[in-house]
Design a protein with these regions (language model features):
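Amphipathic alpha-helical segments
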Residues: 2-27
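Short, charged/polar, Gly/Pro-enriched secondary-structure boundary elements
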Residues: 43-48, 112-115
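Short, internal acidic amphipathic alpha-helical interface segments
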Residues: 66-105
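A short acidic/glycine-rich loop-to-helix N-cap element
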Residues: 114-128
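A conserved amphipathic terminal alpha-helix motif
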Residues: 125-148
Length: 166
């Protein structure tokens, strides 16, 4: 991909975040011209706030949604099992955990082709990029937090994930 295509993808991301497609503006900062960082509040459940990080790469745009909690070392194996079970069957994105510090995030990626076709396709793709992570955090976040803090009512990790998917 050439630098003009990447510059165009950066402009599409900015247009979306600035409300240029639907009027919904996002609070964000630009870092190193190809990265955007911001926050989302008002989610329902135990995890009410998320941060988002958007990286415009050579051929893709990736968004990470992170919660303001980290898995303690002694919980990382259980959290890893939880996110592995949650990820099974997901088609657009996945949970990840950084074993070095316990950060858990939801990652969504779209290709340059999703942004280069036309404005309607770009808007739909950006909407998925920005809204899927919060949706997954709302779906799985309460039981993930329960597991992190030991409030599982003696339910297994498998039961906790199944409860999210009911």
């Amino acid at each position: 991909m050439n630098e003009h295509t990447q510059a165009y993808m950066v402009e599409v991301v900015k247009k979306f975040l600035d409300g240029g497609f639907d009027g919904d503006k996002w609070n964000y900062e630009v870092h190193q011209e190809i990265a955007f960082i911001g926050g989302i509040g008002g989610l329902e459940g135990k995890i009410t706030d998320l941060r988002f990080y958007i990286i415009v790469g050579d051929e893709t745009v990736t968004c990470y949604h992170t919660a303001p909690i980290k898995a303690p070392l002694e919980q990382r194996a259980a959290i890893s099992e939880f996110i592995t079970r949650a990820n099974y069957g997901l088609t657009n994105g996945n949970f990840e955990m950084d074993f070095s510090d316990g950060e858990v995030r939801y990652k969504t990626t779209i290709s340059q082709h999703d942004l280069l076709r036309n404005d309607a396709a770009a808007f739909r793709s950006m909407r998925v990029l920005m809204m899927l992570g919060p949706s997954m955090w709302q779906r799985y976040g309460d039981n993930l937090a329960a597991l992190l803090f030991g409030y599982t009512d003696n339910k297994s990790v498998e039961e906790l994930v199944c409860q999210c998917e009911e």
